[in-house]
C-alpha cells in the first residue's frame, strides 16, 4: 500500500470523526435518571379487606401516605423507558379492632419527555406491573392478616425543575388502576382463600400527588 493511499485513508477517517463529533456533543440531556418522591394518595373506591365497613371508616383508610422510586433510561431526547416502585399506606382503628393497609406497585414504564429544556422537563410514562396488597389488622384482640396479588396499570406524570444538569426538584401525579380477584386471610389459626366478584370493594384504583428529587447522570 503506497503512502498516497495511506494518507487518503487517514484523511477520510479524520473527516468522518470531525463530522460525527459535533453530533454527539449536541446531546443536551443525561441518559439516566433516578427519582424519589413522597406525598399523598387517595383511593377512588372503598378499600377492601377492612375490619369495619362504615362509610366514614372506609373513607379514612382510603387516604394515606404515598411514595415512589423510579429509574428511567433515555436513549433518545424524547423517548424514555424504565421501572417504578410505588407504595401506599394508611391505618385506622375502632373499638373492635384496627387496620394497617399497604399497597405496593412494581412495574415497567415507557413514554415521552414532552418538554425538555435547560431547566424544565415534563415526562409522561405508563406501563403494567404487579400489585401487592397487605392488611395487618386486628379483630377483638386477635391478629388478622390479609394478602393479595393482582395486575395493575400505572400512568405517571412528572414536572421537574433542574437546579443544575444533575439535580432537579419535581412534582408528580400517578394514576394506578387495579382490581382484586381473590385474597388470602389468616385469622385465629385459619387460612382462607376468598374469591371476589368484582364489585367496588375489590377496586384498588388510586391517585397520588407527590414531590421529590431527581438525579441525572
Segments (PLM) and residue ranges:
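Outer-membrane beta-barrel porins/channels
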Residues: 154-156
Amino acid at each position: 500500500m503506497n503512502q498516497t493511499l495511506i494518507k487518503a485513508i487517514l484523511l477520510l477517517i479524520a473527516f468522518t470523526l470531525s463530522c460525527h463529533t459535533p453530533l454527539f456533543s449536541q446531546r443536551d440531556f443525561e441518559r439516566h435518571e433516578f427519582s424519589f418522591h413522597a406525598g399523598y394518595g387517595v383511593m377512588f373506591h372503598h378499600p377492601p379487606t377492612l375490619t369495619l365497613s362504615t362509610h366514614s371508616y372506609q373513607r379514612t383508610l382510603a387516604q394515606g401516605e404515598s411514595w415512589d422510586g423510579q429509574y428511567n433510561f433515555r436513549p433518545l431526547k424524547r423517548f424514555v423507558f424504565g421501572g417504578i416502585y410505588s407504595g401506599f399506606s394508611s391505618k385506622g382503628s375502632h373499638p373492635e379492632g384496627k387496620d394497617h393497609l399497604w399497597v405496593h406497585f412494581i412495574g415497567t414504564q415507557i413514554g415521552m419527555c414532552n418538554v425538555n429544556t435547560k431547566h424544565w422537563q415534563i415526562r409522561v410514562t405508563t406501563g403494567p406491573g404487579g400489585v401487592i396488597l397487605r392488611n395487618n389488622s386486628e379483630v377483638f384482640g386477635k391478629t388478622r392478616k390479609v394478602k393479595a396479588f393482582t395486575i395493575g396499570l400505572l400512568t405517571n406524570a412528572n414536572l421537574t425543575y433542574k437546579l443544575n444538569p444533575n439535580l432537579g426538584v419535581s412534582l408528580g401525579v400517578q394514576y394506578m388502576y387495579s382490581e382484586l380477584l381473590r385474597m388470602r386471610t389468616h385469622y385465629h389459626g385459619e387460612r382462607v382463600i376468598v374469591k371476589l366478584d368484582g364489585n367496588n370493594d375489590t377496586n384498588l384504583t388510586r391517585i397520588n400527588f407527590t414531590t421529590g428529587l431527581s438525579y441525572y447522570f
